Amino acid sequence: MATYRAKLPRGSHQPCHTVFIGHNPSLETWSSGHFFANPSNRFWSLLERAGIVHDANARLDDVLVQSHGYGFCDVIEQPGNNANDITPGQLKENTPLFLNRIENYAHGMNGTLKRLCFVGKRQWKHLFEPPLQRCDHGLQPQDKRPLAWPDLLREVEVWIMPSPSGRAVLSKAERLATYIDLADSFEHEVEEERT
């Protein structure tokens, strides 16, 4: 059995610019050690269709971590295939632990972290007290952060990605649109670095 843990670029790996943040690991992720491993989860196909990854090997999170500068973690590290089995109380109790973890990750990245992409709305909304009633997919306003948001992350973009779970009720076009917007932001960033 593989070991479940956050996957972040380290040492000789490509510097980390983006961390994808799930709600909690599926049972498949917990046992395999690979993120978004549930067969009904569309995460990898969404990245491919949006043009964020371009080769078949990039479907493996290990390859993305080592060669592409992506990281992966979950807000709450409790396995299960139904996010609703994790109560609002558990999410609230976990919030300071998660914020401390993500701040520590950012410290280790030495300023290379550009964006946090929450894969699904629920885990973002429950970082607020009281939890947000609603939020839109896409890039979040810079002034809309949880009260205990670490200062180190103040300039880091926050994106809310549509859930790739088979349980989420969205059309294919709705689900894909924000991933395309994210891919466009990567392209824009590369163009800015060239000029």
Predicted regions and their residues:
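Short, surface-exposed acidic-centric catalytic microdomains
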Residues: 28-92
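C-terminal capping/extension of enzyme domains
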Residues: 1-15, 38-39, 83-97, 129-195
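Short, hydrophobic/glycine-enriched beta-strand segments
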Residues: 17-23
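Internal catalytic-core helix/loop-beta-alpha segment
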Residues: 67-134
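Short glycine-/acidic-enriched loop or helix-start segments at secondary-structure transitions
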Residues: 29-32, 126-129, 170
